[in-house]
A protein has these predicted regions:
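Donor-nucleotide binding loops and adjacent catalytic segments primarily
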Residues: 41, 46, 50, 173-175, ...
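A short, well-ordered alpha-helix in the C-terminal region of glycosyltransferases
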Residues: 329-343
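Acidic donor-binding loop of glycosyltransferase active sites
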Residues: 93-95, 245, 253-268, 275
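Short hydrophobic beta-strand element within catalytic cores of glycosyltransferases
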Residues: 260, 276-287
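Glycosyltransferases and closely related glycan-assembly transferases
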Residues: 83-96, 103-119, 132, 136-137
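Active-site-proximal region of nucleotide-activated glycan assembly enzymes
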Residues: 2, 42, 112-173
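C-terminal alpha-helical cap of glycosyltransferases
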Residues: 342-360
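Conserved nucleotide-sugar phosphate-binding/catalytic loop shared by glycosyltransferases and other
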Residues: 3-8, 27-76, 81, 160, ...
Length: 360
């Protein structure tokens, strides 16, 4: 089987795509994969390092602030369509699968016009612009949230979950003691995205001194961009700071509570692990989709939302104290998260691919 994968821009699109690629290689030793991404976003570095054949196509996203700039965007789009068609004709894939990001629009559209079978996967609870546009052209739409089924054509939409979830379950646990934390004390991880957050850095700096003498431990992952902002803070013995952690998933499996954003990949991670979470949705994303992601979990009793506008040193510490002291709440959140998680999601997507390719 020959498969083209397209996704770009952010880890929320790229890592689910990589999870599916891993499953494809596991199930079909002869599978041929081509990844089409952009020429200037993070996938251009990540994908080749994984040994996956990569083609970059120039593409720009829509400008929501200045619509006149979208004239150039449309010119770039039509050039990208032409380039994508040429690459697809050369590769001759059995199926083209898009995981979002604006590069997926010209690639999936081109595939549909060439009568190549097409699938898109939506990671968030609110569809992205590219996937909403593409849904009318593709053969199948796969979604991570049951709530988003209604946003796509009913006859072609299937709730499969996020393929990242299946990958996570196989990652080995890392003991918190490897980072110098005590085994018998609860651990809280605080992380505001892989790069960190400018707005949250100031709030978290003010909160750190309040963790002194608490009966739990705190690991703050600052993000590489903001680690130096904390250099003047004197830390108590139960608090540690790191710019990043290579295997965060493994450590999350020995963690009691996480304070985090609510992007699609994070949702996949905590539902797969069953890790109770205080979610601080980023208010700076399209359609406020992180809040909707988190609300979907909160409505099932699977997380607690603390909005950024309400986040300060006192609200954070008080909520941590309250939550960690409520063992029944932690237990019920863990149970609700595991019910939401689809830990065979990549396998489900693989099976949908086979059905489509075989015309079943």
């Amino acid at each position: 089987m020959k498969v083209v994968i397209t996704a770009g821009g952010t880890g929320g699109h790229i890592f689910p795509a990589l999870a599916l690629i891993s499953k494809l290689k596991e199930k079909d030793k002869d599978v041929e994969i081509l990844y089409i991404g952009t020429t200037d976003r993070m996938e251009k570095d990540i994908i080749p390092k994984e040994g996956i054949p990569y083609i970059g196509i120039e593409m720009k996203g829509l400008n929501r602030k200045n619509i006149f700039k979208n004239i150039d965007v449309m010119k770039t789009y039509f050039r990208a369509v032409k380039k994508a068609k040429n690459e697809l004709v050369k590769f001759k894939p059995d199926v083209v699968i898009g995981f979002g990001g604006y590069i997926s629009a010209p690639v999936i559209y081109s595939a549909s016009k060439l009568n190549i079978k097409t699938i898109i996967h939506e990671q968030n609870s609110i569809p992205g612009v590219s996937n909403k546009f593409l849904s009318r052209y593709v053969d199948k739409v796969l979604v991570s949230f049951k709530e988003s089924v209604k946003d796509f054509p009913k006859d072609k939409t299937i709730y499969t979950g996020n393929p990242r979830s299946e990958q996570i379950k196989d990652i080995e646990k890392i003991s918190k003691t490897t980072l110098g934390f005590k085994k018998d004390k609860a651990l809280v991880i605080i992380v505001m995205g892989s790069l960190g957050s400018l707005t949250m850095t100031k709030k978290l700096k003010e909160a750190l001194p309040l963790f002194k003498n608490k009966d739990y431990q705190v690991l703050l992952i600052t993000g590489k961009n903001y680690y130096d902002d904390y250099k003047d803070i004197k830390l108590s013995s139960n608090v540690k700071l790191v710019p990043f952690i290579d295997n965060l998933i493994g450590l999350m499996k020995d963690t009691d509570l996480i304070v985090t954003r609510s992007g699609a990949s994070t949702i996949a991670e905590i539902t797969s692990i069953g890790l109770p979470a205080i979610m601080v949705p980023s208010p700076y994303v399209t359609n406020n989709h992180q809040y909707v992601n988190a609300k979907s979990l909160e409505d099932d009793g699977a997380c607690i939302i603390l909005e950024e506008k309400d986040f300060n040193k006192d609200s954070l510490v008080n909520l941590l104290d309250k939550t960690l002291n409520d063992k029944e709440k932690l237990k019920s959140m863990k149970s609700a998260l595991l019910k939401r998680g689809i830990i065979d999601s990549a396998t489900r997507i693989y099976e949908e691919i086979l059905k489509l390719v075989r015309d079943e």
